[in-house]
Amino acid sequence: MNIVWDSENYKNDFNFVPDYGESVAELLTVEKGGKVMDLGCGTGALIPTLVNKGYKVTGVDASDNMLEIARKNNPDVEFIKKDASKLDFNNRFDGVFSNAVFHWIDDQNGLLKGINNALKTSGQLVCEFGGKGCAETVHSELERLFAKRGLKYKRTFYFPTIGEYMPLVEKNGFKVTYAVLFDRKTYLKGDLISWINMFDKAPFEGVDEEVADEIKKEAQENLKTVLCEDGKWFVDYVRLRFKGVKVL
């Protein structure tokens, strides 16, 4: 999916994304000195974590806005602009790390095939992304409000179960050594509308701006008793975290 990110807003107001990625990086057991790709590195917030583990890191992202910040914050690290589903590396990396990226990718087979080709034999893929039911309270309410106005709410993301996704990982040459699907109540710095504006823009494309604003405000008002505690908003995230080792 082609997304134009507000990189500064992402870095300042949605830093929970890289914060949660710290624990994902712990699954990576590549030896020190190994080459690791941070796939969908964004602003490069997790690059220091990987560098501190002793890895030679290459950040890969499709967003110019994100890479501009990543390069500024990590001047000694190699960054490459590339679509995650069109990787053309060959036998280059000992590990691939990815946090909060896979659910944005349309071509999952292309994504996993490219990662497999990029890895050396026995190379590790460590990843976390949205799983089945992620932010469902928000998406269901928006879907209802769209339908109320005769509009179709397009779910432009991919939130699979373990049972749906792990066979795909195995089909693309990996042995799955760890997989878990879990709930993560995720608190926001701002309100629900700010979250929608950052992460759920696609369904509103082509919708009259006044109507879009009306839907967002109504959704926030309707969900206030469900997703707001003591004035602090949260979203009902579900995450799928796994580790795979290249065997083919």
What are these regions (language model features)?
Residues S85-V96:
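A short acidic, Gly/Pro-enriched loop at the edge of an enzyme's catalytic core
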Residues T177-D230:
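C-terminal helical/coil "lid" or tail adjacent to the Rossmann-like core of SAM-dependent
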Residues G95-Q108:
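A short SAM/SAH-binding and catalytic strip from SAM-dependent methyltransferases
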Residues N109-Q124:
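A short glycine-rich, Lys/Arg-flanked "PGG" loop and its adjoining helix->strand segment in the class I
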Residues Y158-N172:
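Short alpha-helix
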Residues M1-G34, A45-T49, M66-I69, N73, Q124-K148:
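Conserved class I S-adenosyl-L-methionine
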Residues M37-L39, T43-K86:
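Class I SAM-dependent methyltransferase SAM/SAH-binding core
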